[in-house]
Amino acid sequence: MILAFVETLAKIHQLDWRAQGLSFLLRRAVGPNLIGREINWYWDGLSWAGEIDAQKRFSGVRDWLLANEPEVPRPVLCHGDANFTNYLFKDNLVSAVLDWEMAFIGAPEADLAYALIGMSSLSSDYPPGTPSDDEMKAAYEAASGATLQHWEYYSVFALYRIVLTHILGLRAFPEDFQAAFQSHVEGLIARLNAAWSAAK
């Protein structure tokens, strides 16, 4: 099932998004480049929500992401929320893909990094035989015919997106649940800082 998930992600990235009328996804936020616009889209979310403390806390990683943005030689349709839980399965094959509100035009590595980090944040206790990250990356390359590049950068970018969406979502939870959820968020922030330190 997990490899079918990765292979479906590769198929999404092969869609002709221009022919499908999806060019409007290029205009989600202001910025000269594809990934920079996405960085700013999540940052704008913090501004709209009045999350000033969060902006102070993450301004360094945002500045680094903007300054080190790789070129995207093959812009693709990114699902955006490429989380295993957003994929429905029948007979071990993907039958539907849900939750497209975070879709954007960007680098395929952004989607795959988000998917792998999202899976590892859901659980560290997968059954025997579950493909490793390296096996899933190899499966993606085999399905897409593309070579993954700038993996450290896109891992930081994925964690930046995950952390900021969690911060924005925190206020939607009941107060008695927020403390437990905050602990989960702090764990993600620690992963973000570690990935950023390793990539610098």
Where are these regions (language model features)?
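Glycine- and charged-residue-rich phosphate/anionic-cofactor binding loop of Rossmann-like
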Residues: 147-151
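Protein kinase-like catalytic domain
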Residues: 13-17, 98, 120, 144
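Active-site acidic catalytic loop and adjacent metal/ATP-binding pocket
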Residues: 12, 59-110
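Regulatory N- and C-terminal appendages and interdomain linkers associated
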Residues: 185-200
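A cross-family kinase active-site recognition segment
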Residues: 1-59, 69-76, 104-105, 178-183, ...
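Glycine-rich, phosphate-binding/catalytic loops in enzymes
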Residues: 29-30, 96, 113-115
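Start-of-helix signal in alpha-solenoid helical-repeat scaffolds, especially tetratricopeptide repeats
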Residues: 153-156
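Active-site activation/catalytic loop segments of kinase-like enzymes and analogous catalytic loops
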Residues: 109-145, 158-175
